[in-house]
Structure formats: C-alpha cells, structure tokens
C-alpha cells in the first residue's frame, strides 16, 4: 500500500511565495523542553486527548510553561475555519464537536492542579453560535470539578455567529475574557483577512457592558510592519473599550509561507510600550519579546486583581 501524502496544514497558503525567515536575535532564543514536569504535563494532556495552543501554534514558551504544569487548552478541535497569515494552527473543514470534551478538560485541570486555567479555541465559523455554548459548558465543567480555580477564556470573534453567542460565554462567568486584536487595523487585510478590527474592538466593549466587573484582556503582535504610532492608537482604542490588560509580543514566522517578520523589536522598545500602556490607564501590561496571551497568565491575574483593588482603594 502506497504511503499517504502528508496532511497540508495550510492549504490556503500553498500558492504563496516563500518569505525569508530572518535569523532570530539572542533575546528570542529559548531552550528545548526536557524537564520531567514538561513530560508529566504532556502525558496528562495526551491521556485526556486534549489539544493545546502551545503545540498547535508553536509557542516558544511551551518548555517553560509545561515544566511548571501550565498549559492553554484549545477546545473544539485542531482545525480552524480561518486562514490568518500569522497563525500556525491547521486550516480546513473541522470535525463535529466532541460533547465529552468539556468534561475531559475539567479532569485535566483538576489533575494538573491548576489554580488559573486558560481556555482558547480555533475559529468555528461553521457553527451557528461559533462554539459559544461549548465554551460555556467547558467553563461550567471546570467550576464543578475545581471550584477554587480561576478561569480565563481567549475567544474567537463570533463574527458570523447568531445573536446571543457572546452573552452565552459571559453568562458562564469566566474570571477573565480575552480576545486578541492581534495587529493594527491597517494590516488586517493581509494579517487577519477573515476578521474585522472594529468588530473585535466592539466585542471587548460589549463584554464590559454585559458584566462591568469582568476583567477584559487583549493582545497584539509587533514586528509585522506596523509603526509605533499605530500601536499607540490600538492602545487608545482598547482603553476606550475599557480593556484592563494588554499583552504585546514579538511576531515569529512559523513557516516560509506565513507572513514575513518585518523586524525584531528590541527589549528596550518593549519597555517603552509598557510605560506608554500604563500611562494610558491599563491595570496590567505584559510587553516583552516572548510575551504571549497566556504566558504567566496565573501570576498576571493575581496582579491584575490586586491592581483593581488598589485603584478602588481596597488594597
């Protein structure tokens, strides 16, 4: 029997010319994962048949996070209905939802002993509600098995979903609602063509309208071709939507078919973005070359909560 051809992870990118991949500077390099903690986390996830964005998106921090028993669960399968030019998650026609997945996620959270758990997903434009009810069921399952754990969701934009999708997630009461803007609006046609900048911004604003006490969070990548003024404008837009927490990290090109790295932003520039963001009123800022949405999310949540209490004069 002839060998089957390898699965093409990004068929929508196959026609694109290869983009040069510049050499990473020293401040981007990370060690390969080898610790026992990493292996234990991997085994728990495998045994529960769970996907993680850590693996699917090729996160550079996977070794550090998994060594500490931290992982970001990716629900609703490994296949995304979008084809963003920066993302390494597989694109194609997804499978049906697994109704037992919320329970398996909750079991893994309990087994890992997570005090703070991050749940994300692929985009599911094929579902009427974009997977909102599946998010809600997962939140409730975790609450049932690990009532002391705090829960952060990193959701898609529900752009093509029926009315009520966002409400379903918010009503399940995650502690943090995260939705990433990813980049400046001028780069959306090439970086995030299936999304709409102002729709995503409005989504974040609506979360606060639905539940003013819920923490909101959003992230952007730099090094895609934006300029400093564009980043500062995104910060202003986020603050106008009452976003509490911003993450800023360096874009890293997964393959030659993905969007090219325009440049590597220096650690000093990240410090400048951090200072600017705090000056604009964010309660929490994470801005480093290796910052990702869920990197150190548990520690960051504790600081975020403390910052709100201090602002309210209750520290």
From Swiss-Prot:
SUPFAM superfamilies: Radical SAM enzymes (SSF102114). Residues 1-33 are annotated as: Disordered. InterPro entries: Aldolase_TIM, Elp3/MiaA/NifB-like_rSAM, LIAS_N, Lipoyl_synth, rSAM. It holds the Pfam family Radical_SAM. Its cofactor is [4Fe-4S] cluster. [4Fe-4S] cluster 2 binds at residues 80, 84, 87. It comes from the Bacteria. Residues 9-29 have a biased composition (Basic and acidic residues). One of its GO terms (molecular function) is metal ion binding. Residues 66-283 form the Radical SAM core domain. It catalyses: [[Fe-S] cluster scaffold protein carrying a second [4Fe-4S](2+) cluster] + N(6)-octanoyl-L-lysyl-[protein] + 2 oxidized [2Fe-2S]-[ferredoxin] + 2 S-adenosyl-L-methionine + 4 H(+) = [[Fe-S] cluster scaffold protein] + N(6)-[(R)-dihydrolipoyl]-L-lysyl-[protein] + 4 Fe(3+) + 2 hydrogen sulfide + 2 5'-deoxyadenosine + 2 L-methionine + 2 reduced [2Fe-2S]-[ferredoxin]. It is found in: Cytoplasm. NCBIfam families: lipA, PRK05481.1, PRK12928.1. This is Lipoyl synthase. The lineage of its organism: Bacteria, Pseudomonadati, Pseudomonadota, Alphaproteobacteria, Rhodobacterales.
């Amino acid at each position: 029997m002839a060998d089957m051809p390898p699965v093409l992870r990004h068929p929508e990118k196959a026609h694109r010319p290869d983009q040069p991949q510049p050499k990473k500077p020293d401040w981007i390099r990370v060690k390969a994962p080898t610790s026992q903690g990493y292996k234990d986390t991997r085994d728990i996830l495998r045994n529960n048949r769970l996907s993680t964005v850590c693996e699917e998106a090729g996160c550079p921090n996977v070794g550090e996070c998994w060594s500490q028993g931290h992982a970001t669960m990716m629900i609703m399968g490994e296949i995304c209905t979008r084809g963003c030019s920066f993302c390494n998650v597989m694109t194609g026609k997804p499978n049906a939802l697994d109704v037992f997945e919320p329970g398996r996620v909750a079991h893994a959270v309990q087994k890992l002993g997570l005090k703070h758990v991050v749940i994300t997903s692929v985009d599911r434009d094929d579902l009427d509600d974009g997977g909102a009810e599946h998010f809600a069921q997962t939140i409730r399952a975790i609450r049932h098995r690990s009532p002391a754990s705090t829960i952060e969701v990193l959701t898609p934009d529900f752009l093509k979903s029926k009315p009520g999708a966002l409400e379903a997630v918010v009503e399940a009461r995650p502690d943090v609602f995260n939705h990433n803007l990813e980049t400046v609006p001028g780069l959306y046609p090439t970086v995030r063509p299936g999304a709409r900048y102002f729709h995503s911004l409005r989504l974040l604003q609506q979360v606060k309208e639905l539940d003013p006490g819920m923490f909101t969070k959003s992230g952007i990548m730099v090094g895609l071709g934006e300029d400093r003024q564009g980043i500062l404008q995104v910060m202003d837009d986020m603050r106008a939507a009452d976003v509490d927490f911003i993450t800023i990290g360096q874009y890293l090109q997964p393959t030659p078919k993905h969007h090219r790295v325009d440049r590597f932003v220096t650690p000093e520039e990240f410090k400048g973005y951090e200072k600017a963001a705090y000056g604009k009123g964010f309660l929490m800022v994470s801005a480093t070359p290796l910052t990702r949405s869920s990197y150190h999310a548990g520690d960051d949540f504790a600081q975020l909560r403390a910052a709100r209490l201090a602002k309210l004069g209750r520290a």
